A protein has these predicted regions:
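Cytochrome P450 heme-thiolate "Cys pocket" and heme-binding signature region
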Residues: 53-55, 59, 314, 350-382, ...
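Cytochrome P450 catalytic core segment centered on helix I
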Residues: 139-215
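N-terminal membrane-proximal hinge/A-helix region immediately C-terminal to the signal-anchor transmembrane segment
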Residues: 1-53, 64, 68, 90-95, ...
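Cytochrome P450 heme-binding "Cys pocket" and the immediately downstream C-terminal segment
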Residues: 254, 375-411, 415
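Conserved cytochrome P450 K-helix E-x-x-R motif and the immediately C-terminal K′/meander segment
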Residues: 1-5, 185, 189, 269-314, ...
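Conserved cytochrome P450 K-helix/beta-meander segment immediately N-terminal to the heme-binding cysteine loop
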Residues: 326-353
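Central I-helix of cytochrome P450 enzymes
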Residues: 106, 117, 121, 179-187, ...
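Cytochrome P450
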Residues: 11-18, 82-91, 101-123, 131-140, ...
Length: 425
């Protein structure tokens, strides 16, 4: 945006995509959020996305369609559901902490910090019994999914009708879908035979309703949505949590101040015992928001097509059917909205500061805001508090450089946090 301005466009294969980093234009765009059109290939991500995630709830559009697709899932990701899983979050966090080495650089990606989130969401979707017996299968399927989705970055897969051809990429998409369907049907068969319990999990209750035609979604929509919820969006939670930890390791004064707040308020208690950590630990909320501002989990929001004959954004007239994305990095680092945006200053999110609406893009905006954001926030809060209760954090080998991913979806952040070093308090 420094080069092209707050509203610009790029070519994505043969498709022009409008990019927004202007808060007013973003607010204008999202006031009509329900009507925005999302196609099964997410407008420009191509055959791989369409084949694996094309019918997930994220692709729904229109008020009735969004309610139809999101409705069966919402109660499982409500504030009540998240509160009911706080014990699981605490358990999985402590189990992860017990695996970490002391006094040597830790690569949080290699150490599988993301498994804290993956295990919690597995429990929410399938219940504890499946978590304990079949988690290794879910990890294998996650690897298979990410390896397949990485093929989105091959330009030819975005060509029209690519999915009609017998290619190696399309065979990999089919192989994942077959493996994912087979695994989930296997679990439901065990459930029907009484060999495993559902534990009130989303999957078994929803599949049972599908069998009786009591829902307006079908099995493919359910499985594509579980791809998104369980396997894909784990990367978003990992980015938020890992960068929060590395930011604290790099900014010792902030770490000291936050630890003092934690010690004073919680008095050594397990953070997962509290459902209102955001209200109890106000400085921590500032820290987490500032970390999310500087390291947004999504480099670009998912594209949404305009539906009006002309949509005016930032003084430009955008024709009908044009994909639009939010450039979160440019927005979150804009000097228009943030003083000294390259500095880590949690106080900019204090209650006394007025944040310009639309200038901070974290979990999306509007009625299609990330379904699992409550879980993501709860997990990040518990993990950060637990780390600071047990450890002093430092940056690995004085290396503040951010590592760049070699693989991954183009709209996720391309960065991985630097290594950290732990010392027991």
């Amino acid at each position: 945006s420094e080069k092209h301005g707050p509203v610009y466009y790029i070519w994505h294969c043969f498709t022009p995509v409008v990019i927004l980093s202007d808060a007013k234009a973003i607010r204008t765009f999202y006031t009509d959020h329900y009507s925005h059109h999302r196609e099964r290939d997410m407008s420009c991500l191509g055959a791989v996305f369409k084949g694996i995630l094309g019918r997930c709830l994220a692709t729904s559009h229109g008020r009735d369609e969004v309610k139809r697709c999101r409705g069966p899932f919402e109660k499982y990701f409500s504030s009540t559901a998240t509160a009911n899983h706080m014990t699981v979050i605490g358990r999985e966090c402590q189990a992860f902490l017990n695996t970490l080495p002391i006094g040597e650089p830790i690569d949080l990606k290699a150490c599988r910090l993301e498994d804290v989130t993956l295990r919690v969401i597995t429990c929410a979707v399938y219940g504890d019994e499946v978590l304990e017996k079949y988690f290794h299968k879910i990890v294998d399927l996650q690897y298979m999914l990410l390896e397949t989705l990485d093929l989105i970055n091959i330009g030819t897969t975005r060509l029209p009708f690519y999915s009609k051809f017998q290619t190696k990429t399309n065979r990999k998409v089919d192989a994942f879908n077959e493996a994912w369907t087979r695994f989930n049907r296997f679990l439901f068969t065990l459930f029907e035979e009484g060999k495993i319990t559902g534990g009130g999990g989303l999957f078994f209750e929803t599949m049972a309703l599908l069998k009786t035609h009591a829902l307006d979604i079908d099995e493919e929509e359910l499985l594509h949505s579980l791809d998104e919820i369980l396997l894909l969006n784990i990367d978003v939670s990992f980015a938020a949590t890992s960068f929060a930890l590395s930011d604290l390791a790099q900014h010792q004064a902030v770490q000291t101040k936050l630890r003092a707040e934690i010690d004073d308020v919680l008095q050594g208690c397990d953070p997962s015992k509290f459902e209102d950590l955001d209200k109890k630990l106000t400085y921590m909320e500032m820290v987490l928001k500032e970390s999310a501002r500087m390291h947004p989990a999504l480099a670009l929001s998912l594209p949404e097509k305009t539906v009006k004959s002309v949509t005016e954004l930032g003084g430009y007239q955008i024709p009908k059917g044009t994909p639009v994305c939010v450039d979160t990095y440019s927005l979150n680092y804009s000097v228009t909205y943030w003083e000294n945006p390259d500095e880590f200053k949690p106080e900019r999110f204090s209650a006394s500061r007025n944040i310009v609406p639309g200038s901070f893009f974290r979990f999306g905006m509007g009625p299609r805001k990330c379904l699992g954001y409550r879980y993501a926030l709860a997990i990040t809060r518990v993990v950060v508090v637990s780390f600071l209760q047990k450890f002093e954090l430092d940056i690995g080998e004085n290396d503040s450089d951010v590592k760049v991913k070699k693989t991954g979806l183009s709209f996720f952040t391309p960065y991985i946090c630097p290594d950290i070093i732990l010392q027991r308090r």
